[in-house]
């Protein structure tokens, strides 16, 4: 079921004066970019290519992850400075959920080209509006529990960006996680809230992750970025000149009658590469990247097990997503379940524990919670079998 339209009164979007609640001096307001792509294959069959996870209410409220992301940005920016980059298949759903955004702030990518093309396009479009802008890029499908702490952390990143650094927001690790990439940082400097990023690290093996956490020098890479658009675009031109030239040409035509033709001609030629690989790793080697460590209850909602860890439970540790669904669920002598009833059928479970049960109109998933990461292999197999209608 799609969340109700997101009706935010403009009064909820704060002014510069209100930002004093978060920081000690007046700061410029961000341009916020929300890349909204990917299908969330570990959340199949709830999340599908045609209705990915960011459009679902996985927040414990009626708001979708995308809506929660926009609401979280209210102390940092305004609707006219908030841009969403999404695929053509999702434009209508994004517009329905984000009625407060101007139509022209939903940027459409004709096909997925990974994160660098999407973020670079937004940066280039913003640069045509304000060449001196500071922009932040924040994923559409993450959960953050402590919004005030997150806002303060982002504002510290803005200060670094104003000095010409390519900033990230790193997450202080709470466990030796093997499903995330890491940022290797330098030592803290007294009086400076950020640390230099020495290297971006791939997802590690368990023993390596444990060493990272023990070191105190490694943070989770949450793919949150803050920078001046001129600095980012200059770094993009240095490392990825073809991609830079492409998005610059698209941005030059943006808002003109030639926009669609230029976008359609150039977009398929852009390299398909993440912004980490394309820009940030090389910039870190050159000493141009810094990070602000954050501890604000971040979660990437990567699979159903994770969802079960962050949403409210009953006395037996069971999580039911969408408790308003009818006829709903009937759980007896069962514990530590994640149940997602989405078909209109009754879901009944008796005498089981540590399972994921997802019931949709055309597919049912049942698996142990500790196999949640492997759900994506089912999606891969369905694709191999040519059963794209299920994915």
Language-model segments: which ranges?
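Short coil/turn connectors at secondary-structure junctions
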Residues: 28-30, 79-80, 102-103, 130-133, ...
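Conserved beta-strand scaffold positions in the cores of enzyme catalytic domains, especially
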Residues: 55, 106, 166-168, 288-291
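Residue-level signal for inorganic ion chemistry
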Residues: 66, 122, 141, 183, ...
